[in-house]
Amino acid sequence: MKPAFTAGELNTYTSPGDVTAVSRALRHTGRRVMLVPTMGALHDGHLALVRAAKRVPGSVVVVSIFVNPLQFSAGEDLDAYPRTLDDDLALLRSEGVEIAFTPTAAAMYPNGLRTTVQPGPLAAELEGGPRPTHFAGVLTVVCKLLQIVRPDRIFFGEKDYQQLVMIRQMVADLNIDVQVVGVPTVREADGLAMSSRNRYLDATQRELAVTLSAALTAGAHAAHLGGAAALRAARAVLDAVPELTVDYLELRDAGLGPAPAHGSARLLVAARLGNTRLLDNIEMQIETPAGTAGPDGDRQYAQSPWRN
């Protein structure tokens, strides 16, 4: 039986086959299908992705809500991840989203892990260091969502910058016909990057969490003095808060290769407050002033690991 679809209302599907059929039918009528993948616990950062998707002329927006077990590493509590489906659907309805895809793990992986996506070497760096299977899980589920929905564009936030870069790599390397759109990080009034993890912070931790964005901002302001200066400025801000356990502070190029001596770069940080792990990053323009160490010195410093 053909799945029902009512234009202008939120239609919720749990079956991959139903979403595929509805998406195909909508494309045949000239609608442009936009996909916003999420794991639920929606906040204004997710809604910024939805609004960016809705701005595309002729678009119909599909938001997937799926807590993907493949991207949780050993020691990470899959069951503890926040699940707020009713609230999420209410938010999507208020935003005028027309399709929500809320599959179960059994529906997404009916044959178990028989076939998965193997990421490239970047998967072992930064976020992949302590979580060696994480990006294989991310890329596998995104690849499946792309096959199920067949969107014209797929939207991701720049907060999870390594994820965005790796999805772009997969789309290019596997010749997947979709445009990957990165949306700038949405922040709280004090600069903290919006994240579903922020709800785990107590009041004191919430005040300290802004240190990450403050450190990145300090680094960006110092970037005109070179990459090493940007890292020193950011490190000084982080060092002033002993409650923070910093996993890494690294300067990379836009594709997360070695940091450039000058030009566009990304400063990335991951740190823990109690049991909550926070991520953030910022784009900056590196300059190399006359008389400084030069490109080799900056590059070596920019790739050095964090030392507490």
UniProtKB/Swiss-Prot annotation:
Beta-alanine binds at Q71. GO terms for molecular function: ATP binding; pantoate-beta-alanine ligase activity. It is found in: Cytoplasm. GO terms for cellular component: cytosol. It catalyses: (R)-pantoate + beta-alanine + ATP = (R)-pantothenate + AMP + diphosphate + H(+). (R)-pantoate binds at Q71, Q163. The active site is at H46 (proton donor). Residues 286-308 are annotated as: Disordered. Keywords: ATP-binding, Cytoplasm, Ligase, Nucleotide-binding, Pantothenate biosynthesis. GO terms for biological process: pantothenate biosynthetic process. Homodimer. NCBIfam families: panC. Catalyzes the condensation of pantoate with beta-alanine in an ATP-dependent reaction via a pantoyl-adenylate intermediate. The reaction proceeds by a bi uni uni bi ping pong mechanism. Belongs to the pantothenate synthetase family. This is Pantothenate synthetase. It comes from Mycobacterium avium (strain 104). The gene is panC.
